[in-house]
A protein has these predicted regions:
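Active-site rim/loop-helix segments in enzyme catalytic domains that contact anionic ligands
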Residues: 1-106, 227, 239-246
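Metal-dependent de-N-acetylase/amidase catalytic core
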Residues: 2-17, 91-247
Length: 247
């Protein structure tokens, strides 16, 4: 387990905790949101649950180094978990408890994970389900495996879609405006850090095209779509922001 900022791995709290199944999932799926949040002064910690061992291109060592560099570009800290390995992630309560331990340790307000849609890499859908379970387990004070940590209830769980096939059909998205040039530049640089995966720019161009499409839906130049696990609660109408429909 390594981090770009080891102080975040022990007891320091973070604002946002992001889980990804493989190196580059976070960068491609919600890297612009991470960049926007860290540039606004919020702390973000990334948890990568494999080193891309099953991938066609790049060694595990390369993949880990690329993710570490991308996290630095995004302004986030990072750690890697050894679970079942790339393409072997299983639905096991032990994994959910391990994720819950991270949630209790870092006490984030917001947690992001890959969507639970089945028509995508199986690690992605399973990770989304495991993180959802972990968010609940983290707030159960009587969990015998976690009695050494104080329970913690996150405020919101949001999903991101790495590919178009992973977009939930039954959840209305929230759109995060990522149009600021410095955000887009940092996000693009973080994706480009995964050199072993970028023999061409096709995948990066796909993500930029998706951001443009979401932006068109949101009435801005570029946007990232996130999908809330639960209804969002606002203290007043003034907090809701603007709607995507431009009446």
């Amino acid at each position: 387990m390594i981090s770009t900022d080891s102080s975040n791995l022990n007891s320091s709290q973070v604002s946002i905790l992001v889980f990804g199944a493989h190196p580059d999932d976070i960068e491609y799926g919600c890297g612009a949101v991470v960049a926007s949040e860290t540039m606004s002064g919020r702390s973000v910690h990334l948890v990568v649950c494999s080193r891309g061992e099953a991938g066609t291109n790049g060694t595990p060592e390369q993949r880990e180094a690329e993710s570490t560099d991308a996290a630095r570009i995004l302004g986030a800290s990072i750690e890697f978990l050894e679970l079942d390995g790339d393409a072997h992630l299983e639905m096991r309560v032990e994994h959910a408890i391990r994720f819950a331990r991270i949630i209790r340790r870092l006490r984030p307000q917001t947690v992001l994970a890959t969507t639970c849609m089945e028509n995508q890499h199986p690690d992605h859908s399973r990770l989304g389900q495991l993180v959802r379970d972990a968010a609940r387990i983290a707030r159960y004070g009587g969990m015998k495996e976690l009695l050494d940590q104080e329970a913690h209830a996150i405020e919101q769980l949001l999903y991101y879609a790495v590919t178009p096939e992973a977009v939930p059909r039954d959840i209305n998205p929230i759109f995060i405006d990522i149009s600021a040039p410095d955000v887009m530049s940092r996000w693009t640089s973080a994706m480009e850090a995964h050199k072993s995966q970028a023999a061409t720019r096709n995948y990066i161009d796909l993500q930029l095209t998706r951001a443009s499409l979401f932006g068109a839906q949101a009435g801005v130049e570029f946007a990232t779509a996130l999908y809330p696990n639960d209804p969002l609660v606002f203290g007043s109408l003034a907090q809701t922001g603007k709607g995507a429909r431009r009446f």
